[in-house]
């Protein structure tokens, strides 16, 4: 079984002054392991399932057209889960705690806007 097929385009919301809150949060507030895990989740989960993540542990509708991507796994676990036919053993959880939320909006049928996010582990 190959890697999942991307069905949705992910775009960062950009304000009138050019700020991209989700991108800024990812680049300035997250540790390297958190960024790698989030990048994997965006590629392997959100870009494949879009708003359909809300039917899984990875998403939840929050109202008014918004939903959140919910992440509590590291990059290695996400990659392993995306290739279940892999002969490799399940990776051990790293010591880095991952508990991230990214707020999203489905724009049209194939675009997901990334609006902002927070580290629930640091800011419960």
Regions found by a protein language model. Name each.
Residues 106-114:
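Active-site beta-strand-loop-beta-strand hairpin of nuclease catalytic cores
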Residues 1-98, 108, 119-124:
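Basic, Lys/Arg-enriched alpha-helical interface segments
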Residues 101-104:
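Hydrophobic/aromatic beta-strand elements that line small-molecule binding cavities or substrate pockets
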């Amino acid at each position: 079984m190959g890697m999942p097929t991307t069905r949705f385009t992910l775009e960062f919301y950009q304000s009138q002054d050019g700020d991209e809150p989700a991108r800024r949060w990812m680049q300035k507030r997250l540790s390297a392991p958190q960024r790698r895990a989030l990048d994997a989740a965006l590629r392997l989960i959100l870009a494949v399932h879009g708003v359909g993540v809300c039917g899984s542990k990875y998403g939840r509708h929050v109202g008014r057209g918004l939903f959140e991507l919910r992440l509590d796994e590291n990059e290695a676990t996400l990659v392993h889960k995306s290739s279940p036919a892999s002969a490799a053993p399940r990776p051990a959880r790293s010591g880095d705690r991952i508990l991230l939320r990214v707020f999203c909006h489905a724009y049209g049928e194939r675009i997901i806007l990334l609006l902002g996010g927070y580290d629930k582990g640091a800011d419960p």
